[in-house]
């Protein structure tokens, strides 16, 4: 699915390349993602780091807003490095009493579950785990595979994207803490690789290929998430990792030493489905390697050199034997034979444009948010 109508080119600053068909380069060969980071994101991020009192003031504001409530905020927890460290920052550095929220989609590896348990126990936090109905998750994931789109992790992602704010409002928590931060997450995969959580498209794909109603599956549209919840329910999203020095490798060592936290191979590989989707399905079927985005973010953050990233990209995303085992496991768990699953993988590639979608509305909203200075990251 790479653009064969233009010569191959890789950014001279990061490792993004023309596998993103919309990428552009300046006269020095630097991509538009890098230029956007240096012009729009880095200045505001550095301003936050120059304000040592910002974290304390933010904590005081959250405590004031949550006065009289059992919890000061709610934190989405995956067991990964960002959300694990966020729990530490919230409890120990900000003095907050957060409720930890996790989602069991049926695919988490033991390392993720154990990491969550270690952090929650060590910090003496309360946790709520939402268990997604497996039959509904399975049906939606099968529908997505049959749709032939690249975004096979959308059913899982959406259950988390929707579940967290839905539960926050239901439980009366106005402050949602996120592990996202502007620095190492400014280059997100282009929409042809990983489309946004478009509820209209999710429903259309499920209508065409699903076999059972989604009665309990967590759902949340962009208008509800971006407008209704913040304006009418007072929900606020806060990103404390923007307010502290955040070197991911140092944070990993800190978590290991203090909590017995265990690392995993790559970003998001704490989940067997995501590991297979990002490490096998996307590269083999579409030619997309999300590590290019992850490594480019680390390059911009100063925690990885371009040479190190290029060397990593020469290696497979993870062990090829494990890929085949994951492939067989996922097919069996979804009720597919090996031949049926391979037929899906070999099928005609499609995108969100082949289904009903809200891309025009999402684009318009992004333009407005960027104009207002609310959104600084580059989307396409």
Show where each model-derived region lies.
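Short, glycine-rich nucleotide/cofactor-binding loops
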Residues: 73-82
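Hydrophobic positions on the alpha1 helix immediately C-terminal to the Walker A/P-loop
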Residues: 85-86
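Nucleotide-activated chemistry modules centered on ATP-dependent adenylation/adenylyltransferase
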Residues: 2-73, 89-380
């Amino acid at each position: 699915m790479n653009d064969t109508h233009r010569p191959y080119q890789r950014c001279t600053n990061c490792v993004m390349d023309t596998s993103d068909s919309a990428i552009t380069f300046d006269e020095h060969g630097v991509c538009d993602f890098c230029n956007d980071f240096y012009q729009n994101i880095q200045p505001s991020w550095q301003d936050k780091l120059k304000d040592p009192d910002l974290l304390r003031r933010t904590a005081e504001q959250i405590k004031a807003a949550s006065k009289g409530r059992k919890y000061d905020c709610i934190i989405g927890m995956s067991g990964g490095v960002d959300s694990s460290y966020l729990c530490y920052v919230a409890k120990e550095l900000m003095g907050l009493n957060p409720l930890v929220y996790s989602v069991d989609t049926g695919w988490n590896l033991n390392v993720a579950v154990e990491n969550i348990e270690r952090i929650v126990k060590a910090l003496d936090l309360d946790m709520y785990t939402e268990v997604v109905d497996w039959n509904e998750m399975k049906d939606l994931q099968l529908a997505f595979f049959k749709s032939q789109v690249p975004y096979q992790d959308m059913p899982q992602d959406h259950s988390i994207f929707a579940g967290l704010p839905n539960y926050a409002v239901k439980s009366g928590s106005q402050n949602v803490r996120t592990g996202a931060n502007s620095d190492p997450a400014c280059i997100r995969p282009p929409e042809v690789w990983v489309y946004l959580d478009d509820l209209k498209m999710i429903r259309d794909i499920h209508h065409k290929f699903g076999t059972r109603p989604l009665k309990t599956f967590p759902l949340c549209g962009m208008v509800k998430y971006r407008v209704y919840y913040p304006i009418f329910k007072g929900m606020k999203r806060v990103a404390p990792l923007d307010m502290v020095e955040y070197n991911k490798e140092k944070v990993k060592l800190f978590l290991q030493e203090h909590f017995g936290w265990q690392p995993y191979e790559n970003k998001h590989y704490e989940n067997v489905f995501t590991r297979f989707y990002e490490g096998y399905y996307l590269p083999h079927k579409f030619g997309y390697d999300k590590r290019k985005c992850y490594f480019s973010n680390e390059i911009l953050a100063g925690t990885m050199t371009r040479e190190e990233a290029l060397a990593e990209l020469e290696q497979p995303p993870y062990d090829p034997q494990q890929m085949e085992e994951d492939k067989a496991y996922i097919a069996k768990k979804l009720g597919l034979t090996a031949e049926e699953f391979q037929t899906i993988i070999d099928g005609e590639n499609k995108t969100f444009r082949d289904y009903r979608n809200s891309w025009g509305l999402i684009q318009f909203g992004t333009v407005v948010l960027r104009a207002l200075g609310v959104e600084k990251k580059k989307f396409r």
